[in-house]
């Protein structure tokens, strides 16, 4: 469910990066589309307009944990190989390691679990609206 990936982008920017760096910076220019408009439109489209040909099973929701896991491992590997660096030339461009490696790993774990949670929520909402529209 790729829509969970863009949903994750929306929630990370809105709830984590926005309060730290400022929403006005993260929603400027093209980022307005990437961080706000496209994620919201895709989630709304999935919930209200997408009618799956086959039922999306609960097992499918776990697949959404793969992408942030791979991305997070590549992110950490980049920092391990190249070093964290100093702002503004840092390899930790999200600032996840500002509070140390332990907190950074907890943030990484939370993001992977949040991706799964978003997928479960979207699946449940889609199931409800699909039933509603198919009953008419």
Feature-to-residue mapping (PLM):
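Membrane-interface loop-to-helix entry segments
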Residues: 28-40, 108-109
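Alpha-helical transmembrane segments in multipass membrane proteins, preferentially the mid-helix core
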Residues: 39-56
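Small-polar-interrupted transmembrane alpha-helices in polytopic inner-membrane proteins
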Residues: 1-17
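Non-cytosolic membrane-interface motifs at loop->transmembrane helix junctions
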Residues: 22-34, 57-61
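Interfacial segments of alpha-helical transmembrane regions
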Residues: 1-5, 57-65
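Membrane-interface transmembrane-helix boundary segments in multi-pass integral membrane proteins
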Residues: 80-83, 87-123
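Hydrophobic alpha-helical membrane-insertion segments
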Residues: 61-77
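Juxtamembrane "helix-exit" motif on the non-cytosolic side of transmembrane helices
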Residues: 14-24, 80
